[in-house]
């Protein structure tokens, strides 16, 4: 069974949950947003933890590989769409390197 699509979808959903869960308190603290932003923050961060728990692999491996997806998401999506800053070619190259690292960690052949 090929777990790559499932793993990648889980990582993408996890990254979105973490990015939103970290951005909402940023809005509250930095931009004077409502304290009510902390409620969806808690829900997003709880969903982030839950999504990480769905991976069948060892937690340390999942956390390490997820870091690469988070970096790529933060640069390729959040920086561009939310912050309105176009990533440089170096940002994109770094994100691609991180995704290669994630793929090596998660999809390398292993003995059972």
Curated annotation (Swiss-Prot):
Transmembrane segments: 8-28, 32-52, 62-82, 92-112
Alphabetical list of InterPro entries matching this protein: UPF0060
This protein's record includes keyword Membrane: yes
Cellular compartments annotated: Cell inner membrane
Protein name: UPF0060 membrane protein XOO1791
Membrane topology term: Multi-pass membrane protein
Family statement: Belongs to the UPF0060 family.
NCBIfam families reported for this sequence: PRK02237.1
Organism field: Xanthomonas oryzae pv. oryzae (strain KACC10331 / KXO85)
Membrane among keywords: yes
GO cellular component, one term: plasma membrane
Keywords carried by this UniProt record: Cell inner membrane, Cell membrane, Membrane, Transmembrane, Transmembrane helix
């Amino acid at each position: 069974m090929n777990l790559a699509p499932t793993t990648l979808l889980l990582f993408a959903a996890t990254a979105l949950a973490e990015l939103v869960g970290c951005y909402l308190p940023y809005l509250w603290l930095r931009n004077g947003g409502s304290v009510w932003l902390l409620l969806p923050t808690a829900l997003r961060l709880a969903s982030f933890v839950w999504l990480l728990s769905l991976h069948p692999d060892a937690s340390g491996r999942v956390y390490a590989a997820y870091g690469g997806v988070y970096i790529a998401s933060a640069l390729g999506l959040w920086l561009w769409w939310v912050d309105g800053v176009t990533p440089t070619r170096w940002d994109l190259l770094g994100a691609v390197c991180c995704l290669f690292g994630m793929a090596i960690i998660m999809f390398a052949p292993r003995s059972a």
